[in-house]
A protein has these predicted regions:
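Charged, alpha-helix-forming regions
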Residues: 1-164
């Protein structure tokens, strides 16, 4: 995945192919997760899917129940926890880096009330737009805004740990 938002594709699958094969159509909005790739050695790629899509075996889709969860919040929370997800779910051995999917599905992120999820996602969307709009500007300004974005993203997604 080269982008944090999937809004179109270079390749398309016909309705007939979906009907007559094992291809599964993932409805938007959802979240794409890379589960097998050499990039998993250092990065956990996650993207928001804004169009209906299909994937190969190297990716999984997380279909979000919009009555309970804001998909943008889930995307940001997974992105912010990427290194911890890799630490807890990476498969040892093998010729290509991969994640143990059941462990990935068991990974917990803090989930506040839906209106709070939406508020956090709206704030992070604004920071994200600011960083991307500035990308044609001065490199030092870009670096400062990215650092600010990461700081606020991590602060917004920090919650007290639950007592056992």
């Amino acid at each position: 995945m080269r982008s944090s938002k999937i809004q179109n594709s270079m390749m398309n699958v016909t309705d007939r192919a979906v009907r007559e094969s094992n291809v599964k159509l993932i409805e938007a909005p959802s979240i794409a997760l890379v589960v097998r790739s050499s990039i998993l050695q250092h990065t956990f790629p996650v993207a928001q899917i804004d169009v209906d899509a299909t994937f190969n075996q190297d990716m999984k889709a997380l279909v979000v129940d919009s009555d309970r969860f804001e998909h943008r919040y889930i995307y940001y929370a997974l992105s912010a926890n990427g290194q911890e997800i890799l630490r807890q779910t990476s498969k040892q051995g093998g010729s290509v880096n991969s994640l143990v999917v059941p462990r990935l599905m068991d990974f917990e992120i803090p989930v506040p009330a839906l209106d709070e999820q939406q508020r956090i996602a709206d704030l992070l969307d604004r920071f994200d737009a600011l960083v991307n709009d500035i990308s044609s500007g001065l490199p030092s300004e870009i670096a400062a805004r990215r650092a600010q974005y990461e700081h606020y993203r991590d602060r917004l997604l920090s919650f007290p740990e639950k007592k056992a």
